[in-house]
């Protein structure tokens, strides 16, 4: 190998390392901001990270472990995988990976695959039943492990897709919440990747070379409604760059007085002569003011205040 080739290889390696460092910092920042905005993790928490073997959950676990090293509070992490007994599932991959990184883990074996195949007719989607079964098992496991938070790997794109799924097929303005409490009040579920782009997660997963396990039960089903919505959003993103970011911002800027749900806003109670603080009234007749700024902002150039010493300020329990 001549000197010019060696120099070119060195420059390429430096560029790859630089880009990976930027990507990791962006994911750390987005996860840290989501944790802070929604008070997802507090001092003394035991976070159960649900690991499926897909790119999202691997990235979630990796970033949380990374943040844990510099967090100003103490919290524990335990990784949990639900082995659903799908035919051909490589049972050795996750235990070997988790042992290699030295994280506490538990593999839960439940034949939900057999139940789903028995209950759901051939050709029908299995997602709904499979999801309910998994949820019950994971809630039970969290209780057994003494986990105070259950972390799932859903990201920003998942939340947007769910919003449109519910509008198109369910007639509801509803998405995935970044944080929720179970119906019985015993479990808190968090989604620390809520601010993360799927594109970033995909790149990070490839760079880290996670041992990905495909979901043959879900991913192989044709004509899923979620896949239709995903492709629609991807098309919009190609045709109108920046629209995905704008739509996600809309989920964080909701004006209840300009929707049509009387259970959330007292339309009947509006009387002439009233002046309501914080409610847009005749502004509704004005032409919308669109800020004159680029649709896409380079996230690497954004400045975010992480508190003292550049660390994310997790809320501490008093």
From Swiss-Prot:
Motif stretch (PP-loop motif): 52-57
Coiled coil: none
Record's keyword terms, sorted: 4Fe-4S, ATP-binding, Cytoplasm, Iron, Iron-sulfur, Magnesium, Metal-binding, Nucleotide-binding, RNA-binding, Transferase, tRNA processing, tRNA-binding
Leftover remarks: The thiolation reaction likely consists of two steps: a first activation step by ATP to form an adenylated intermediate of the target base of tRNA, and a second nucleophilic substitution step of the sulfur (S) atom supplied by the hydrosulfide attached to the Fe-S cluster.
Locations listed in the record: Cytoplasm
Recorded GO CC terms: cytoplasm
Protein's recorded name: tRNA-cytidine(32) 2-sulfurtransferase
Domain of life: Bacteria
GO biological process terms, semicolon-separated: tRNA thio-modification
Organism: Actinobacillus pleuropneumoniae serotype 5b (strain L20)
MF (Gene Ontology): 4 iron, 4 sulfur cluster binding; ATP binding; magnesium ion binding; sulfurtransferase activity; tRNA binding
Membership in a protein family: Belongs to the TtcA family.
Subunit and partners: Homodimer.
Function of the molecule: Catalyzes the ATP-dependent 2-thiolation of cytidine in position 32 of tRNA, to form 2-thiocytidine (s(2)C32). The sulfur atoms are provided by the cysteine/cysteine desulfurase (IscS) system.
Alphabetical list of InterPro entries matching this protein: Rossmann-like_a/b/a_fold, TilS/TtcA_N, tRNA_Cyd_32_2_STrfase, tRNA_thiolation_TtcA_Ctu1
Catalytic activity: cytidine(32) in tRNA + S-sulfanyl-L-cysteinyl-[cysteine desulfurase] + AH2 + ATP = 2-thiocytidine(32) in tRNA + L-cysteinyl-[cysteine desulfurase] + A + AMP + diphosphate + H(+)
Metabolic or biological pathway: tRNA modification
Recorded name of the encoding gene: ttcA
């Amino acid at each position: 190998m001549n000197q010019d080739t060696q120099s070119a290889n060195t420059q390429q390696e430096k560029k790859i390392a630089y880009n990976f460092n930027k990507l990791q910092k962006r994911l750390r920042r987005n996860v840290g901001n989501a944790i802070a905005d929604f008070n997802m993790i507090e001092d003394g928490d035991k976070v159960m990270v649900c690991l499926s073997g897909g790119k999202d959950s691997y990235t979630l676990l990796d970033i949380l472990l990374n943040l844990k090293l510099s967090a100003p509070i103490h919290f524990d992490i335990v990784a949990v995988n639900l082995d659903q007994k799908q035919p051909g599932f490589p049972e050795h991959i996750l235990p070997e990976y988790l042992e290699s990184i030295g994280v506490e883990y538990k593999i839960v074996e439940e034949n939900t695959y057999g139940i789903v195949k028995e209950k759901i007719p051939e050709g029908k989607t299995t997602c709904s039943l499979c999801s309910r079964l998994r949820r019950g098992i994971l809630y039970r496991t969290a209780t057994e492990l003494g986990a105070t938070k259950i972390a799932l790997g859903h990201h920003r794109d998942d939340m947007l897709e769910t919003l449109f799924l519910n509008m198109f097929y369910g007639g509801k303005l509803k998405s995935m919440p970044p944080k929720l409490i179970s119906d019985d009040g015993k479990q808190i579920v968090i989604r620390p990747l809520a601010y993360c782009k799927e594109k970033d997660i995909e790149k990070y997963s490839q760079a880290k070379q996670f041992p990905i396990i495909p979901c043959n039960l879900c991913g192989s089903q044709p004509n899923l409604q979620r896949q239709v919505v995903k492709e629609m959003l991807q098309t919009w993103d190609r045709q109108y760059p920046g629209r995905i970011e704008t739509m996600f911002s809309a989920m964080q800027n909701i004006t209840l007085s300009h929707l049509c749900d009387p259970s959330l806003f007292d339309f009947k109670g509006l009387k002439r002569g009233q002046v309501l603080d914080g409610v847009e009234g005749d502004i509704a007749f004005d032409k919308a003011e669109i800020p004159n700024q680029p649709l896409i902002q380079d996230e690497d150039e954004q400045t975010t205040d992480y508190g003292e010493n550049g660390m994310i300020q997790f809320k501490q329990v008093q």
